[in-house]
Regions:
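Short, amphipathic alpha-helical "lid/cap" segments that border enzyme active or binding sites
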Residues: 62, 100, 191-199, 297-305
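Short, conserved SAM-binding segment of the class I
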Residues: 95-102
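A hydrophobic C-terminal alpha-helical subdomain
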Residues: 209, 247-309
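Oxidoreductase cofactor-interface core, primarily capturing Rossmann-like NAD(P)-dependent enzymes
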Residues: 2-26, 30-31, 35-40, 56-59, ...
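CheY-like receiver
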Residues: 63-64, 102, 136
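Conserved Rossmann-fold cofactor-binding substructure of NAD(P)-dependent oxidoreductases
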Residues: 41-69
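Redox-cofactor binding/interface segments in oxidoreductases and associated redox assembly factors
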Residues: 51, 70-75, 113
Length: 309
C-alpha cells in the first residue's frame, strides 16, 4: 500500500487526482494522512484509508504509515523553518526526517521524495532542505534500511509571480517595473503535467525507479525577461524587468513593500541560482511520460494568460 502525504496541497492533491482520474492505482491501495479535509468525503466512498498525521507528532506519523510498503513524501511548505540559514535538522529537513524515520519504523520499504528543480549543490536557499533530505535518504539506502526515488519537480508554471517580484496582485497589479535580483532560463512546468508524471512513477513497479534521482520538468525554457514580455502582451501595457543586486532587492521589498526580512533574504538567493542556469533542465523524463499518454507540456504562456485574465 502507498501512503500519500500533503494530499490537500497543490502538488499532493494534483498527484492524487492524477492517480484516480487515470486509474493508475487501485484506491484500496492508497492511504492519505489528512482525514479532516472536506475534500476527502467523496474519497472515503472509494475505500481510500484516511489517517491523521502531523510532522510535529512522530507517533501520529508512524500510525498513519502502518501497513504501507511505500511512502510518497511531499516536502513540507513550512518555509519559515529554513530562514536565517537554519542549521542541519532545524530546517524543513527536520520534518522530512521525522516522516522518513516514522515510515521505516512502520515497515515502509521505499520512499518517493519530491525535491525541487534546482541543482545539487545549489546556491538557492530554497534547495537547502531538499539537499539535506536527499543526502539522508542516500545514507539510509547505503545502510540497507530502505530504497528511495528522488523526483526533482520542476518550477511550477503557476509559481511565476513569486519569481517575478512577488507579482501576486496579478490583474490588480499596477507596477510598471518589477525588481528582481537576477535572471536566467527556467524550465517552467505546469502542476498538472508534473502531477501526471509523478503519478506514473508511483504506479510503476518501484524497482523501475529505485535508486534514481531525476527531474520532472519540460525542456523548453523562459527567462524572467520573457515573462515580462508575456505579461506586457496580456496586459496591453509594458511591464519592465529591472535587475538589481541582492542587497538592493532585499532592501526594496522590506522597506518599500513591507515584507519580512528573513523571508526576503532567504528567497533572494534563488536569483543567484537562476543566473547560474540551475533551473535550465535537460531531462526528458517528464516529456517521455507525457508523450506515452498522448500529451504535451502545457506552455508557460498559457498559464500566465489564464492567471492574468
Amino acid at each position: 500500500m502507498l501512503a500519500l502525504t500533503s494530499a490537500t496541497g497543490k502538488l499532493g492533491s494534483a498527484v492524487l487526482n492524477a492517480i484516480l482520474d487515470n486509474k493508475l492505482i487501485d484506491p484500496k491501495e492508497l492511504t492519505s494522512s489528512d482525514p479532516s479535509s472536506e475534500r476527502f468525503s467523496s474519497l472515503r466512498a472509494q475505500s481510500i484509508t484516511l489517517r491523521q498525521a502531523n510532522f510535529d507528532d512522530p507517533s501520529s506519523l508512524a500510525s498513519a504509515y502502518k501497513g504501507c510498503t511505500s511512502l510518497f513524501l511531499v516536502s513540507t511548505p513550512r518555509i519559515e523553518m529554513d530562514y536565517n540559514n537554519a542549521p542541519l535538522w532545524h530546517g524543513r529537513e527536520a520534518h522530512h526526517r521525522a516522516a522518513i524515520d516514522a515510515a521505516l519504523q512502520a515497515g515502509v520499504q521505499h520512499i518517493y521524495y519530491t525535491s525541487l528543480g534546482f541543482a545539487n549543490p545549489s546556491k538557492a536557499g530554497v534547495m537547502r532542505a531538499h539537499i539535506r533530505t536527499e543526502a539522508y535518504l542516500a545514507d539510509l539506502a547505503k545502510e540497507g534500511k530502505c530504497t528511495y526515488t528522488v523526483l526533482r519537480e520542476g518550477l511550477y508554471n503557476e509559481s511565476w509571480p513569486l519569481y517575478f517580484g512577488y507579482y501576486f496582485g496579478l490583474k490588480e497589479e499596477t507596477r510598471k517595473e518589477v525588481i528582481v535580483a537576477g535572471d536566467g532560463n527556467v524550465s517552467w512546468t505546469s502542476i498538472p503535467d508534473m502531477a501526471f508524471g509523478t503519478a506514473k512513477v508511483l504506479a510503476a513497479p518501484r524497482e523501475q525507479w529505485a535508486g534514481k534521482t531525476f527531474y520532472l520538468s519540460q525542456k523548453k525554457t523562459h527567462s524572467l525577461s520573457d515573462i515580462a514580455r508575456i505579461v506586457s502582451k496580456v496586459r496591453g501595457e509594458e511591464v519592465k524587468l529591472k535587475v538589481v543586486s541582492r542587497k538592493e532587492y532585499e532592501d526594496y521589498y522590506v522597506n518599500e513593500k513591507g515584507m519580512e526580512r528573513p523571508s526576503v533574504e532567504w528567497w533572494s538567493s534563488t536569483y543567484d541560482a537562476l543566473k547560474d542556469g540551475e533551473c535550465e533542465i535537460d531531462d526528458g523524463t517528464l516529456e517521455a511520460l507525457l508523450k506515452e499518454a498522448g500529451r504535451a507540456p502545457k506552455p508557460l504562456e498559457e498559464t500566465v494568460e489564464e492567471m492574468l485574465r
